[in-house]
Amino acid sequence: MEILFVASEVAPWSKTGGLGDVAGALPRALAARGHAVSVVTPRYGTIDPHAHRLRPLHRALDVRGEPTTLWVSRDRAPVYFVEHEHFFGSRRGLYGEAHDYGDNAERFAYLARAALALPGALGLRPHIVHLNDWQTGLVPFLLRREHARDAALAGARTVFTIHNLAYQGVFSKHVVPALGLPWDVFRYEAMEFHDQLNFLKAGLVFADALTTVSPTYAREIATPQGGVGLDALLRHRARDLHGILNGIDVEEWDPATDRHLPARYSAADLSGKAACKSALQRELGLPERPDVPLVAMIGRLAEQKGLDLVVAALGELLARDLQLVLLGTGRPELEEAFRRAARERPDRMAARIGFDEGLAHRMEAGADLFLMPSRFEPCGLNQMYSLRYGTIPVVRAVGGLEDTVEDFDGWSRGTGFKFRDYHPQAMLLAVRRALEAHRDRRAWRAMMLRGMALDFSWDRSAQAYEALYRSLAAP
């Protein structure tokens, strides 16, 4: 099949979160399965065409009478970078710097039209146009309204993926004329949302199929508690909504080959994991104790990630015989709470405020447990990294965490520990269960091996998307 994939960020060229990872990995996995995949994204000012060996295309796109030039990557799934100096090239950020850019509606309406102009200019004939998050939400409507007679897009079906429903691209209704949209889109059945224009809602209303990044998150967003104001629409489209779990880069995240680790290991030989633990304790200034459970946390210090639960429980956590290590940045009050705990209990706590890719790998390898108490989690990556590295996750049973971690039954089943209530005591109970299980080395090793045997590759995800694409393209 021929697939056009449109995203506002694509790793490794541009990334602010999980969307960039998906847009960088899924098209390649689909191409490896024999599909012809092209990706469209902006050429932001942070992307140096020469450093990335991008090739200029001497064919201009006509976007509402304005010529647009392109760059293309040298990939099996080529990435086409849309050039626009004012909207993209002159900006240091993707969506904003201290605050969102005031013209984000115009910027991403431009991306939507450029993406739809590209097939005709390059001789592509996509069967599927796959959109991602609010930045591409106008594409399904524009395909129907402005490209209904476009031979290059004849019969193309649209898939719209929600990576995080909390980010919706909501703008003043006064931008409608500036975007070249007709006023009939500004109604409840289309893009109107509390007297504003909602780009994400546009995608949900007009796309042929909807997906999100885990089966449980697909169910959660169709409830009043998880729907962020769009649950009724998602229930209305329940037959078209599919939860497909993200994958991870199993080459980058492989303890047998990981270049960031002081010692490598595998399910066949776990001895290197103990060496990684000792090295991590030394690196972070903790007492070097092979017997003590080492608990890691990595990620944004934000309310979504449940770090307020950890702060509330820090006293009880650090009263136990364990070591807690944290890597991340975010809300200043959370940063200070972890810094203060590390100062007060340097034998039990280490906090690194910031981000360090190598240290993230070493923490996944050196820890015994990974704590992820998210308030909500569309998919989550770190629990999958942890399972692959033989590090047992302790998670709140939401979104992708529910789908990827099986609760330990106390004997022979399970890959981690789960709790449901969003409360410090519920989290502490799960941690206590994990610490008790850690004392049984035989059962613990068996749990590690069960997790390490799971398949979280992008090929598994690509197969699920492939099945959805085929169902849409079938006559």
Swiss-Prot record:
InterPro entries: Glyco_trans_1, GS/SS, Starch_synth_cat_dom. It is an enzyme of class 2 (transferase). One of its GO terms (biological process) is glycogen biosynthetic process. CDD domains: GT5_Glycogen_synthase_DULL1-like (cd03791). Keywords: Glycogen biosynthesis, Glycosyltransferase, Transferase. Synthesizes alpha-1,4-glucan chains using ADP-glucose. PANTHER family: ALPHA AMYLASE DOMAIN-CONTAINING PROTEIN, GRANULE-BOUND STARCH SYNTHASE 1, CHLOROPLASTIC/AMYLOPLASTIC. The gene is glgA. Belongs to the glycosyltransferase 1 family. Bacterial/plant glycogen synthase subfamily. It comes from the Bacteria. HAMAP family: Glycogen_synth. GO terms for cellular component: cytosol. Its EC number is 2.4.1.21. GO terms for molecular function: alpha-1,4-glucan glucosyltransferase (ADP-glucose donor) activity; alpha-1,4-glucan glucosyltransferase (UDP-glucose donor) activity. This is Glycogen synthase. ADP-alpha-D-glucose binds at K15. Pathway: Glycan biosynthesis; glycogen biosynthesis. It catalyses: [(1->4)-alpha-D-glucosyl](n) + ADP-alpha-D-glucose = [(1->4)-alpha-D-glucosyl](n+1) + ADP + H(+).
